[in-house]
From Swiss-Prot:
Naturally occurring in which organism (per UniProt): Pseudoalteromonas translucida (strain TAC 125)
Protein's name according to its UniProt entry: Ribonuclease PH
Any GO BP: tRNA processing
Listed EC numbers: 2.7.7.56
GO molecular function term, any single one: tRNA binding
Keyword match Hydrolase: no
Keyword annotations of the record: Nucleotidyltransferase, RNA-binding, rRNA processing, Transferase, tRNA processing, tRNA-binding
Reaction it catalyzes: tRNA(n+1) + phosphate = tRNA(n) + a ribonucleoside 5'-diphosphate
HAMAP family assigned to the protein according to its UniProt record, in alphabetical order: RNase_PH (MF_00564)
Keyword tRNA processing attributed: yes
Record: residues binding phosphate: 86, 124-126
Function: Phosphorolytic 3'-5' exoribonuclease that plays an important role in tRNA 3'-end maturation. Removes nucleotide residues following the 3'-CCA terminus of tRNAs; can also add nucleotides to the ends of RNA molecules by using nucleoside diphosphates as substrates, but this may not be physiologically important. Probably plays a role in initiation of 16S rRNA degradation (leading to ribosome degradation) during starvation.
Length: 237
């Protein structure tokens, strides 16, 4: 039995609240149960130096956690003078995933920066960030079309992400912190709305896992991501 009494394939309640802030071209508060992340999308003309002259756009991402997003206070990384390795890994993951969903040529020489700020953490912050960032990105692209910055929609497909894992010998989806911290296997999966894989991150925290267990985890992820993308589309309708 899971601590939340959810079934193995049952995800937490998921919501996407659009236009959550005033100034950003796209802003979404995404909630996966008690995990809450504010995702904003900022549009700027021009691209990084290494992209200039290619006729393509770029998507960056930054990720951070508020000091009291967790059970105990964590000092702001700015106060420590540098970002941690986990932060850099997650923000690169978010950016990679979003770039895979966009035709960068159709974006023109424009840059979209996605900021994902974790307000409250209860497991799955990176996957919630990716799922929320995709909705914020859609709103930013709509803004760009309305302003005449682009002629067509660069979005190739919606994307979403979910955590899956093996907890007390059982494959489960959408791990809360109490499950994630004790899981024998922890995996993050990012898929397109067509069911294609963008990225899989999986680690055996305790015992190695089998190919059969891997298949079971990926099946759980595919089912869960289909549910999340349905909620994304409802929020955007």
């Amino acid at each position: 039995m899971r601590p939340s009494e959810r079934t193995a394939n049952q995800i937490r309640p998921v919501t996407f609240t659009r236009n959550y802030t005033l100034h950003a071209e796209g802003s979404v508060l995404v909630e996966f149960g008690n995990t809450k992340v504010l995702c904003t999308a900022t549009v700027e003309s021009g691209v990084p130096r290494f992209m200039k002259g290619q006729g393509k756009g770029w998507i960056n991402a930054e990720y951070g956690m508020l000091p009291r997003a967790t059970h105990t206070r964590n000092a702001r990384e700015a106060a420590r003078g540098k970002q941690g390795g986990r932060t850099m890994e997650i923000q690169r993951l978010i950016a990679r995933a979003l770039r895979a969903a966009v035709d960068l040529k159709a974006l023109g020489e424009n840059t979209i920066t996605i900021d994902c700020d974790v307000i409250q953490a209860d497991g799955g912050t990176r996957t919630a960030s990716i799922s929320g960032a995709c909705v914020a990105l859609v709103d930013a692209l709509t803004h760009m079309r309305a302003k005449g910055m682009i002629n067509s929609n660069p979005l190739k497909y919606m994307i979403a992400a979910i955590s899956v894992g093996i907890y007390k010998g059982q494959a489960i989806s959408d791990l809360e912190y109490i499950e994630d911290s004790a899981a024998e296997t922890d995996m993050n999966v990012i898929l397109t709305e067509t069911g294609k894989i963008i990225e899989i991150q999986g680690t055996a925290e305790g015992e190695p896992f089998s190919f059969d267990e891997l298949d079971e985890l990926l099946t759980l992820a595919k089912h869960s991501i289909r549910e999340i993308i349905d909620v994304q589309k409802q929020a955007l309708a």
